[in-house]
Amino acid sequence: MKKALTILFATALFFFASGNLRAQSIISDTICNDGTRIVHVKPEGVCSVNIEIHIRRNRVTFLEYTKGCNGNAKGIAALVEGMKVKEVIRRLEGIQCGKRPTSCPDQLARALKMIYGKKE
């Protein structure tokens, strides 16, 4: 059985590029013995209610959205698997869904920036 170091955060404030104050919450942040970081994020302003992100050696190794557009969520996951975190942010940041100032891909990019800081 793998031991894991779990760090729970109540809420991490995050600002949308549009200037509107929104809260994007990190539900859990776990680092497994093999070095895989597993983060659960509650996105804001989209249909999805949870994003589960696995990162190992600065690459996204698994991605899953809960609720939202099932096919699009699976497509995003298939495309970013194996991609470097920096590249995911570069490609997905700023994508909008209809008239919303954000989207599920944008929420992923914002979550990764929140986790790794603006340097990524």
Enumerate the language-model features and the residues they cover.
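Active-site- and interface-proximal helix/loop "cap" or "latch" segments in soluble metabolic
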Residues: 35, 42-120
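Sec/Tat signal peptide C-region and signal peptidase I cleavage site
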Residues: 18-23
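Bacterial N-terminal signal peptides that target proteins for export
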Residues: 1-9, 17
